[in-house]
Amino acid sequence: MIYKKNFSKLSPITNLIRSALLNCRGMYITLRYMFKPKVTLNYPLEKGPLSTRFRGEHALRKYKNGEERCIACKLCEAICPAQAITIEAQERDDGSRRTVRYDIDMTKCIYCGFCQEACPVDAIVEGPNFEYATETREELMYNKSKLLHNGQIWEEAIDLRIKKNSQFY
């Protein structure tokens, strides 16, 4: 059984001293945090640091010579637990395969990163971009050209992230 002290039975002087001490304690805590550096960021104007392992917007990469990396092995499509990736491939004259259609439904994607880990040529990656809000759901259906465009925009950042995290893949 928990006993509560009944402060109403204390003398007025004791209550006054107790209240003053509690006020001083509260002011001490307030003053202690007042002079510490702020932890709140003013988001649209200030952005916090991102981990190099952050999983954001998807991108398809190209080689330095301009040829797309994707070899249409469809491992990313097979491993995707949300079944958000759709690939159609076509064989080239030289016998290699390339994608004709590469779609990702970003409304289904759970950003697990399995597609990135399964890809043998680092073609599909999740980049550092997290600001891709849209007004309609249709804009979140990424096709091959949108994914290649993302790869062009974020190539330097993606390359740096892959180099830093190569030991984990």
Swiss-Prot record:
It is found in: Cell inner membrane. Keywords: 4Fe-4S, Cell inner membrane, Cell membrane, Iron, Iron-sulfur, Membrane, Metal-binding, NAD, Quinone, Repeat, Translocase, Ubiquinone. [4Fe-4S] cluster 2 binds at C80, C109, C112, C115. GO terms for cellular component: plasma membrane. Binds 2 [4Fe-4S] clusters per subunit. Coiled coil: none annotated. Pfam families: Fer4_7 (PF12838). InterPro entries: 4Fe4S_Fe-S-bd (IPR017896), 4Fe4S_Fe_S_CS (IPR017900), NADH_quinone_OxRdtase_chainI (IPR010226). Residues 61-90, 100-129 form the 4Fe-4S ferredoxin-type domain. NDH-1 is composed of 14 different subunits. Subunits NuoA, H, J, K, L, M, N constitute the membrane sector of the complex. NCBIfam families: NuoI, PRK05888.1-4, PRK05888.1-5. Belongs to the complex I 23 kDa subunit family. This is NADH-quinone oxidoreductase subunit I. It comes from Ehrlichia chaffeensis (strain ATCC CRL-10679 / Arkansas).
